[in-house]
């Protein structure tokens, strides 16, 4: 049994040394994947924490995201609205009816109240322009 544990430790240390296992690379690639799916920075942070990634790597990853795009949460929220067909993607007559529900959906996905309000206040034309850029 001890031989097996030693063998596992040797294999793991070899994989870490050759960078096949790395919290840094995992956090960067997973964050990139989650951003493409429209996740907020808070949701990404909580996901990485739940996976046991070290805080320093999470901080580096979040800083890199903010460095690349200062308002990443806004664009991620726009992607989420498109994906779930909420907020500005609703028809104009339905938007006031679903305002609170849509704010709640955005909040549960980790977006701040200010970001959620900015999204909900977008006109249909502005929303479509932003979507065409993404």
What are these regions (language model features)?
Residues 1-134:
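An alpha-helical, amphipathic repeat domain used for nucleic-acid recognition
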